[in-house]
């Protein structure tokens, strides 16, 4: 803790507030527009990847059934 005499309270408060203002740049909120665009693009890419991965399995399940001649040959 910092001990400040009653005569120097105003001086201390001014110096401390100036210090905080000088270092406030690192605390400013950042622009979130770019972040939402990136997350939407990432979500779309992930959805496309899931759809692409599911497509081959869907094609395999909808294949035409084997004919009796093809089954007998196996």
From Swiss-Prot:
Give UniProt keywords alphabetically: Cytoplasm, Ribonucleoprotein, RNA-binding, Signal recognition particle
> What InterPro entries does UniProt report for this protein, alphabetically?
Signal_recog_particle_SRP14, Signal_recog_particle_SRP9/14
**Primary subcellular site in the record, as a coarse category:** cytoplasm
SUPFAM superfamilies recorded? Signal recognition particle alu RNA binding heterodimer, SRP9/14
Highest taxon, organism lineage? Eukaryota
Q: Name one GO biological process term.
A: SRP-dependent cotranslational protein targeting to membrane
Any idea where this protein resides? Cytoplasm
Q: What Gene Ontology terms describe what this protein does at the molecular function level?
A: 7S RNA binding; endoplasmic reticulum signal peptide binding
Reply yes or no: does the keyword Cytoplasm apply.
yes
Could you name the Gene Ontology cellular component terms for this entry? signal recognition particle, endoplasmic reticulum targeting
State the family it belongs to: Belongs to the SRP14 family.
Its job: Component of the signal recognition particle (SRP) complex, a ribonucleoprotein complex that mediates the cotranslational targeting of secretory and membrane proteins to the endoplasmic reticulum (ER). SRP9 together with SRP14 and the Alu portion of the SRP RNA, constitutes the elongation arrest domain of SRP. The complex of SRP9 and SRP14 is required for SRP RNA binding.
Known partners and oligomeric status:
Heterodimer with SRP9; binds RNA as heterodimer. Component of a signal recognition particle (SRP) complex that consists of a 7SL RNA molecule of 300 nucleotides and six protein subunits: SRP72, SRP68, SRP54, SRP19, SRP14 and SRP9.
Name under which the protein is recorded: Signal recognition particle 14 kDa protein
Source species of the chain: Macaca radiata
Gene that encodes it = SRP14
């Amino acid at each position: 803790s910092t001990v400040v005499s009653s005569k120097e309270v105003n001086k201390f408060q001014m110096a401390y507030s100036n210090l905080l203002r000088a270092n406030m740049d690192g605390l400013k909120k950042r622009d979130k527009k770019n972040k939402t665009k990136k997350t939407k693009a990432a979500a779309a890419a992930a959805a496309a990847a899931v759809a692409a991965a599911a497509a081959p399995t869907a094609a395999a399940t909808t294949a035409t059934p084997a004919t009796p001649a093809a089954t007998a040959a196996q």
